[in-house]
Amino acid sequence: MSRIEAVFFDCDGTLVDSEVICSRAYVTMFQEFGITLDPEEVFKRFKGVKLYEIIDIVSLEHGVTLAKTEAEHVYRAEVARLFDSELEAIEGAGALLSAITAPMCVVSNGPNNKMQHSMGKLICCTTSRINCSAATIFSAGSQTRR
């Protein structure tokens, strides 16, 4: 059997229980622009989908054009507010991280600041040894598209 060289974790829904919170933030964001969505449907349809793709889909379905950067600002502010008050580590995540001896990192499609926020909450809720420096967080959202 080969030695494990590193362990990569997705953050949302794996280390922190953020997916329902993010769905609620989508609902709030769209309400700001006069679009009412069912939170449960948002969770089922858009779990793991990138923010701008969600904005495109909902805009098309509702026959509107939303300014993505303005909508993103509303969404990010609501996510930060909800994370501060409600975000919790997934049960057992801290113990799992503490038990792993291989190097670890966190990967995500979200922006680095969201991951820093999530990981900060995880560290506050656990005694894990994961290092939350920029070197251990890899964000596809921060990469430029070609």
Where are these regions (language model features)?
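Active-site neighborhood of HAD-like aspartate-dependent phosphohydrolases
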Residues: 1-44
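Short, acidic loop-to-helix structural element flanking the phosphoryl-transfer center
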Residues: 3, 81-106, 112-116
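Short beta->alpha linker loops
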Residues: 21, 46, 50, 74, ...
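Conserved H-loop
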Residues: 36, 65, 125-129
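Metal-dependent phosphoesterase signature
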Residues: 58-95
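Substrate-recognition "cap/lid" segment bordering the active-site pocket of phosphatases
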Residues: 105, 111-146
